[in-house]
């Protein structure tokens, strides 16, 4: 038998798949339209990919934690708890992620010598936050799913 966590990791790979594919195309088109520098393109793409991983993990984790097995209409696939908690959690995650990625480098206006350090620290914090969110959401979902007894 396959572990619940491995099952959720496989589902996460499928849920996350649109972000690298569609996200790259959209970021590339917007960068071309804005005549953005290559570094700005890479920064935007990294932000889309990291935040996409976090939001996908949250949605998947909440869906696994509060499953509905008796749905017949795809619109009623989510339980009320999963449908209410997931958007709140991933909007909070997005807010914190944006505060980290834009807030720390903005402090460089006060201390210009630390601009590079603050930028690197902000990206490392975002990577750490995303890893923590993905691990937490999937672990929570797997633990709750393991408790489900099908009758």
Each language-model region and where it sits:
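Hydrophobic alpha-helical transmembrane segments of membrane proteins
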Residues: 3-151
């Amino acid at each position: 038998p396959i572990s619940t966590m491995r099952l959720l990791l496989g589902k996460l790979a499928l849920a996350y798949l649109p972000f690298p594919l569609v996200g790259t195309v959209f970021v590339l088109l917007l960068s071309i339209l804005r005549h953005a520098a290559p570094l700005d393109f890479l920064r935007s793409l990294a932000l889309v990919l990291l935040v996409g991983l976090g939001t996908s993990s949250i949605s998947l984790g909440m869906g696994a934690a509060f499953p509905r097995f008796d749905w017949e209409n795809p619109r009623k696939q989510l339980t009320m708890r999963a449908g209410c908690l997931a958007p709140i959690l991933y909007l909070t995650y997005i807010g914190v992620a944006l505060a980290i990625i834009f807030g720390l480098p903005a402090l460089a206006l006060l201390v210009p010598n630390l601009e590079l350090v603050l930028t690197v620290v902000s990206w490392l914090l975002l990577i750490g936050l995303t890893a923590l969110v993905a691990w937490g959401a999937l672990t929570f979902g797997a633990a709750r799913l393991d408790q489900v007894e099908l009758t």
